[in-house]
């Protein structure tokens, strides 16, 4: 049962969870030194004063620390989760209530998120986060996105308003596409210039993840990008830490909580060997699994082979492996015909952003197959011959659906990147014409520096003659933008 109060601008599962959420937020703050240092550094300057930030990002305890950092820097914030299963309800309740409110008198941030949303509820929540009552355009002037759904809704709204019509729902390519078309049909009917007006004041978007960044580059290539974007995902302190070390932690956490199956001795297939795949493969090997990689990219395949992994095609191992994890950000990685060949009680899960890496629609259409819920976000699919597959989080992010996502320390890196990127776009609009940018190198290094003390790291300082010799400043940046780390 979700809590919605017509006097309050939020919708969460249960406000009575706020005290529990606040305790976990306090614990997380200690593990998020980057965000806390940024709060302290910018508290007086208030660089986000006047910013209206719409956030579409997993509503977790760690995200709560990000939200309260944005507020501490002067921003107003409205928030929705970017996944139907990823919200931690106690964190959402704590944000809605706020540090100075009570469940009877909430004084926090408008948040629209609960674990287990339907697709209709999910997109309604995104719409609410983008709708700012009593403002000039009725919308935000900044977006903080993860996966690009908030950005997508604005762009599709503007596109269809320009065309004068929304495509028929009969043209929808999926259930989610149908829901988006229904939402935009309603909003365009109610207010024919809603999205065009809303988009006019947006100074920019900062995008968290690979999938959303891919969308941004596509829109820029096609000439349809409406406002500048910072690609936070490809900041070194995001992709080389969150994607690798975060997944190394949270993949195993999700599988363990979901199944309680011993991983040691099992054969696990990791589809993709990018930063996420590398972290997943390392964690599975650390548990004693025999890990096999599938890859399309010869460079990543060579890396996997040099790291000691067998690299082959899914067809070669689909009937032999015990665990399958997709990490690619692409679609149709494991199809229904592949799952039909898997072993009894094979475990299938995804840690890429969307739910289209695993062909869940095709699986559901298999003649005679029966779906049964073991517990939330864990389902068995039983074939007519009695074979059972265990599918995690219905093909969505298993580390957030079956567990609580990445740990606080690694998210402090990513969310410090996000905060600094928001400050960049909001305070320097003249320096960022419409394009897709990466986080400036000096800010990337700053985020890393903010996390060293808590790990007991002591940096060596360049002498001036050494700095001159390699052509850098004593205080950095130390690497060229093309350096790969």
UniProtKB/Swiss-Prot annotation:
EC code: 3.13.2.1
Cofactor (UniProt): NAD(+)
Residues given in the record as substrate binding sites: 60, 146, 208, 238, 242
Keyword annotations of the record: Cytoplasm, Hydrolase, NAD, One-carbon metabolism
SUPFAM superfamilies given in the database record: Formate/glycerate dehydrogenase catalytic domain-like, NAD(P)-binding Rossmann-fold domains
Annotated compartments: Cytoplasm
Pathway entry: Amino-acid biosynthesis; L-homocysteine biosynthesis; L-homocysteine from S-adenosyl-L-homocysteine: step 1/1
One GO BP annotation of this record: one-carbon metabolic process
Gene Ontology, cellular component aspect: cytosol
HAMAP family noted in UniProt: AdoHcyase (MF_00563)
Function: May play a key role in the regulation of the intracellular concentration of adenosylhomocysteine.
Protein name per its UniProtKB record: Adenosylhomocysteinase
Organism: Streptomyces coelicolor (strain ATCC BAA-471 / A3(2) / M145)
């Amino acid at each position: 049962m979700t809590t919605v109060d017509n006097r309050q601008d939020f919708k969460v599962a249960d406000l009575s969870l706020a005290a529990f959420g606040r305790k976990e937020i306090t614990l997380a703050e200690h593990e998020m030194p980057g965000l806390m240092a940024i709060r302290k550094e910018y508290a007086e300057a208030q660089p986000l004063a006047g910013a209206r930030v719409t956030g579409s990002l997993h509503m977790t305890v760690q995200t709560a620390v990000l939200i309260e950092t944005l507020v501490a820097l002067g921003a107003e914030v409205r928030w929705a989760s970017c996944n139907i299963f990823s919200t931690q309800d106690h964190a959402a309740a704590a944000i809605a209530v706020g540090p100075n409110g009570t469940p009877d008198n909430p004084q926090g941030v408008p948040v629209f998120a609960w674990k287990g949303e339907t697709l209709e509820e999910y997109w309604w929540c995104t719409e609410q986060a983008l709708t700012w009552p009593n403002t000039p355009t009725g919308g935000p002037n900044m977006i903080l996105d993860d996966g690009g759904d908030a950005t997508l809704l604005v762009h599709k709204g503007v596109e269809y308003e320009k065309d004068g019509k929304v495509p028929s729902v009969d043209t929808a390519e999926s259930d989610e596409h149908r829901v988006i078309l229904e939402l935009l049909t309603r909003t365009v009917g109610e207010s024919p210039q809603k999205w065009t007006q809303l988009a006019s004041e947006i100074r920019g978007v900062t995008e968290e993840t690979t999938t959303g960044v891919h969308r941004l580059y596509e829109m820029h290539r096609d000439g349809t990008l409406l406002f500048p974007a910072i690609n936070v995902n490809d900041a070194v302190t995001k992709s080389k830490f969150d994607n690798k070390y975060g997944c190394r932690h949270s993949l195993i956490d999700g599988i363990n909580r979901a199944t309680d199956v011993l991983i040691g001795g099992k054969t696990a297939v990791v589809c993709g060997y990018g930063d996420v795949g590398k972290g997943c493969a390392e964690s599975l090997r650390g548990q004693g699994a025999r890990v096999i990689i599938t890859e399309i990219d010869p460079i990543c395949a060579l890396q996997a082979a040099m790291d000691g992994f067998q690299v082959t095609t899914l067809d070669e191992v689909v009937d032999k492996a015990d665990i399958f994890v997709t990490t690619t950000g692409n679609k149709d990685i494991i199809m229904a015909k592949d799952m039909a060949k898997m072993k009894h009680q094979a475990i299938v899960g995804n840690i890429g952003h969307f739910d289209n890496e695993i062909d869940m629609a095709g699986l559901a259409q298999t003649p005679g197959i029966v779906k049964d819920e073991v517990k939330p976000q864990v389902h068995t699919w039983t074939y007519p011959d009695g074979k059972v597959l265990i599918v995690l989080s219905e093909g969505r992010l298993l580390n957030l659906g079956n567990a609580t996502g990445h740990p606080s320390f690694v998210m402090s890196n990513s969310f410090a990147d996000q905060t600094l990127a928001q400050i960049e776009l909001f305070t320097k609009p003249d320096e960022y014409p419409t394009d897709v940018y990466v986080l400036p190198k000096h800010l990337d290094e700053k985020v890393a520096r903010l996390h060293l003390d808590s790990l007991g790291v002591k940096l060596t300082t360049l002498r001036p003659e050494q700095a001159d010799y390699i052509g850098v400043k004593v205080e950095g940046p130390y690497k060229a933008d093309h350096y790969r780390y």
